[in-house]
């Protein structure tokens, strides 16, 4: 079999030509752009010397405001001021269950759109406007056009969310070199590969609590290879959620059940300010409408404990996935503005029993890592380290009985390609439905459907003779292509998995947890399903044989065979695996004798009229 070569998308074919590459952290709360100048990464400022661009877009009557200029409109005009658009990326309207002040309308393929003064705007379009601001900032600062960009995404972004990010970049006029997981970018920024001269492998935890997402990754650096051993996270857990918990507490203190959109915006702004101030102060005052509340550190810690517990639970699970103990971890790296909180740092310190690394500005570390990677991919840097991201969830296809055949397991390093042969179930089958799924369960009904396509033109053959090679290929951005090819005829078909909307905020977490909780149950159920499929195949083959050669059996033999057949059918109505297997064996006792009679008949038929000398010569 030929080796499959997968190159980094967009990599420069002219390595000696210096080209402008940027790294972009498209964040929930803030976004940044960085580049490598004279061999050193640098976060680029705007004309007012600001590094952070708040991820906010306001649509006015005749103009659009971005970033800091859009901030005042969060309270003054909340319905037309889009904040934290990243939380809406790749989601359906039904998936968005958290409170927000926007008027969402359905659009094609159930993707939501914001009803604004400037018309309907999709999350992709709004993200594109933020990316365009960062692209313009880079080109103004560098006085040169940008040739390519690496854009970071949460490790737990699924296929739809990654594709939405790529679409936004395309709308912004950016050439995407690669989508890079945010924790992986942080590891690059810290230069953890510089410790590769040590004799032992080095393991690192990247704890990334941003504005809207949480990711934790365990990375290992060994013999020049930088590999993500395991990832976990939550697509809707971050600083925004801490703000909402403070708002919930404040409402309870003030005996308020429901807030208007305008008042809710006031509470959110006050909560965010209080959270930030508590990083350096013991207590703060929240000015809310006509009331003032005092919030101290112990109270704040108790308020957000439920969110911190979720992050710690994910950390422990990822450690188990990587088959590591706490003593195997050399360093813990903090990423994301929310890790500035003393309460977050305290929780991380306690669970990992060591002081976490936070020497690089946690708001900037991801953009810095992205810029270093972009500089490598564009061809400006020859770095010896190899960076391997991983698939967050397993990928497979549906087989008979509604079972999942896994081709690529979760936490497999990407880019990756896997091939496997399948065959037909029925005689004369000329088409095969390929149903692609994502998840950790053994039954299709418990996994997420990613797409379907049909391979037509399979030559009619006896069941089990056709050879269909199915290939799953995941590129460096985590985007999946599935193809199928029939060996004898060469007919083929494929699908690029680009679903119209992604997992809901809890779906990714749910798929993983259910996979662990139901592992034993799924194993038993899979055994039952496989046993039933095999039994049904025996019955179908017997039915076909009886249609042709039933006359070979006398009445007693036929009655015995039919009795065994009906007994097996009755057992298939239940779920006793041993009883089904016993019934299959009893059927085979009778069907094997029938098969011998059939074989003799067909040999006699084949040799009829053939002289012995002719037969000997032909052999």
UniProtKB/Swiss-Prot annotation:
SUPFAM superfamilies: Actin-like ATPase domain, Heat shock protein 70kD (HSP70), C-terminal subdomain, Heat shock protein 70kD (HSP70), peptide-binding domain. GO terms for biological process: iron-sulfur cluster assembly. Keywords: ATP-binding, Chaperone, Nucleotide-binding. GO terms for molecular function: ATP binding; ATP hydrolysis activity; ATP-dependent protein folding chaperone; unfolded protein binding. InterPro entries: ATPase_NBD, Heat_shock_70_CS, HscA_NBD, HSP70_C_sf, HSP70_peptide-bd_sf, Hsp_70_fam, ISC_FeS_clus_asmbl_HscA. Belongs to the heat shock protein 70 family. Chaperone involved in the maturation of iron-sulfur cluster-containing proteins. Has a low intrinsic ATPase activity which is markedly stimulated by HscB. This is Chaperone protein HscA homolog.
